[in-house]
Every structure is written in C-alpha cells, then in structure tokens.
Regions:
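Active-site region of glycoside hydrolase catalytic domains
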Residues: 2-50, 74, 93-95, 103-376
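Generic alpha-helix structural propensity
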Residues: 61-68, 76, 85, 101-108, ...
Length: 376
C-alpha cells in the first residue's frame, strides 16, 4: 500500500493554498434561470471543433452541486478558491437587461465560500463572452470593453463587499490568439488583425474594469492572470536568442507592456504594422490599470528558433528530450522560478499569485494508495 503526504504547514503563513475553476468548465445548467448563450456554447456545437462534440451543458453540475463541492474543498484543507463569474448569467445578451437570478447564484456561492473559511478569488472573465456580443464582432470591437466594464460594475455592486481578491481576465493570450488567430478555441476565428484588435480591446477593458473595482470594491486587491510564456532559445545561436525575445513580444509583452508601460512593443510595429490597432488617448493607462498583484499560470516553456521566412521571424520547435505529461507537455519545474524572476526584474512586480500550475496524467483510482494532507 502506497502512502503519499503533503505538509502544507511548511509553507509561509501568507501563502494561499488554493484551487481554481472556470464557470463554463464546471457549472453546467447552461440554459437555467435565464443564462444566455456564450461563445463556448456555440463553439461546442460547431461540427469538428470539439472532440466527440463534448460540451459544458452539464459538466460537473456545479450550478446545482456547489455546496457539496465547497464541502469537499473544506475537507481537503483548501485555503482559497478561485472561481469565475459567467458573463452570460448576468447579462444574457452581453449588455442591456440584467438577469437577477444569475447574481443570486454568485451571491450564494460567495457566502458559501466564506462560511467554510475559504478566501474567494473572483475572476470576472474566463473566456465565456456572450454570443450576442460576438455576433456583433466580439473582442475586436471597441465597445465590448465598455460593455465589460458595465458587467464588472454590476457584479461588484452585488459581491464587491465580500471579495478580497479580484481578477479582471484569465489568460488574455488564449482569449485573443486561440480565439481569433489560430481558431483552436471559441469563437474559432483566424485573422491576425482581429487578434491584435481584440488584444487592444481587452487591454482597454482591463483599465476600465480596474476603475470600477476601485469604486465598488475599494477594500479588494485586484489584478490580472496571464499564462506568460517562458521563451527559451533552442540553440545558443544569437539569432535564436533574438527570436526568443521576439516571441515574448508577440505573446506576452502585447499585454504586459500596455499594462505596465502604456505602450505596445516596438517590434510589432516593425514586423506587422498593418495589424496593429488605433490607440486613443486614455486607452492604455498604466496608472489606472496597475494591478495590485500579478497572477501567473505556468505549465511549460516554449523553445524557439529564428525563421526569416515568416512574418514574425521565428518558429516553435519541440522541447529537448525529457519527461512529459500525458498531454505531451515537457516538465521543467525550474522554469517557474526563472519566469517569476524575469517578470519581477522587467516590470518591478512585487506581488505574485501562482494561479495555475500542474500536470495532466491518465490517473485512475487506486485502492492501495492514499494521500495525507497536513494543513496549518
């Protein structure tokens, strides 16, 4: 019989041992109590987009079983729970009329989290744009930022007095590049200009949302969560080192530079000027948008070589031989430390949360194996 142990008492006293979810991934009940259609509802129903046409219609049924789920977290000794609010539950059409039953659900959820002694971290957007806003152009359209700010205000007026930690966006890169560049996630579009315009709308939306957070949840700490790339040159060649820095511009500084410096990387104007958005006065304000903390999602590094035949002259290559997860992702724990240090040094970030980290395996329940978790 195999016994595993995890001693959380060894962690610093201000370390929050937590778990995270996203509304569409766990809630189910997609048509319950007035919820509107999201881009993921549509994407999952588009033939060929999702393996075996799986969808989030039921998922973990968290919408109906949230009390049981919170009880399990308490039993595990979890200290913090990061959840997301589903925009289509609050504004079924993205803007206009509010659905009060959606607010009621998250009101009960937050109270339930607090009642069990957990610290709630609320993510305002985890990829589930209301479909009606996508039908009008989606994130590439400037006015979506204004609708997002109104949605954020509505949520914060109801929940803000009980939320110590608030996240504006989860993984801007995935929202923009997977949604509008390579089409691998909802809404499944493929256009570089739309991608960069979506990024600008999202960057502007973060600033507007931070204004609303300061106004309606003044006691909260607020930030953003990014799956920042640790870009490593595949060789020691100077051109590959340049390519690795360029990948950081392409995937990460597109969001980091506006957040902390109020501008976009110069390399993007040099390589793809035709795709870059118009910037109006006040769009990118690093004072108003400055986060209280930075949430980092880290899973694996990316390895890069120069490729002058491409508009952005680089190419991703396979990681060196070594251990991999069941998803084929390389396992490089030291990359987390390296990435944290890079971000600290480049942007003077003082407070981090590791908001996602881990690995996927084809696990099966084992009757001869168990874990003991020692909590503070």
């Amino acid at each position: 019989m195999t016994h595993h142990s995890l001693d959380l008492k060894a962690l610093p006293k201000d370390f929050l041992w937590g778990v995270a979810t996203a509304a569409y991934q766990i809630e189910g009940a997609v048509w319950a109590n007035g919820r509107g259609c999201s881009i993921w509802d549509t994407y999952c129903r588009t033939p060929g987009k999702v393996y075996e046409a799986h969808n989030g219609d039921v998922a973990c049924d968290h919408y109906h079983r949230w009390e049981e789920d919170l009880d399990l977290m308490k039993e595990l000794g979890i200290a913090s729970y990061r959840f997301s609010v589903a925009w289509p539950r609050i504004f079924p059409r993205g803007c206009g009329a509010v659905e009060p039953r959606g607010l009621d659900f998250y009101d009960r959820l937050v109270d339930g989290i607090l009642r069990r002694g957990l610290v709630p971290m609320c993510t305002l957007y985890h990829w589930d744009l209301p479909q009606e806003l996508e039908d009008r152009g989606g994130w590439p359209e400037r006015d979506v930022a204004d609708h997002f700010a109104d949605y954020a205000e509505t949520v914060l007026r109801r929940l803000g007095d009980r939320l110590p930690l608030i996240v504006t966006f989860n993984e801007p890169y995935c929202i923009c590049f997977n949604g509008y560049y390579n089409g691998s996630q909802a809404p499944g579009r493929k256009n570089l200009r739309l991608t960069h315009h979506a990024a600008h709308t999202l960057n502007r939306a973060h600033v507007l949302a931070m204004d609303r957070i300061r106004a309606y949840a003044p006691g909260a700490k607020a930030g953003i969560v990014m799956n920042t790339t640790l870009a490593l040159p595949a060789t020691d060649r100077p051109e590959d080192r340049v390519a690795a820095e360029l990948l950081m511009d392409w995937e990460d500084r597109l969001f980091l530079d506006p957040l902390f410096r109020g501008r976009y990387p110069e390399s993007l104007y040099r390589h793809v000027p035709e795709s870059m958005p118009e910037i109006r006065e006040g769009d990118l304000d690093p004072v108003r948008g400055k986060p209280d903390f930075f949430g980092l999602n880290y899973y694996f590094p990316s390895y890069v070589v120069a490729d002058p035949t491409r508009p952005i002259p680089l190419r991703l290559v396979d990681a060196p031989a070594g251990p991999r997860t069941a998803m084929g992702w390389c396992i490089v724990p030291s990359g987390l430390t390296e990435l944290l240090l890079r971000l600290r040094d480049e942007y003077a970030i003082e407070t981090f949360y590791i908001t996602e980290n881990g690995s996927a395996w084809n696990d099966v329940p084992e009757g001869d194996s168990w874990w003991t978790i020692s909590t503070p």
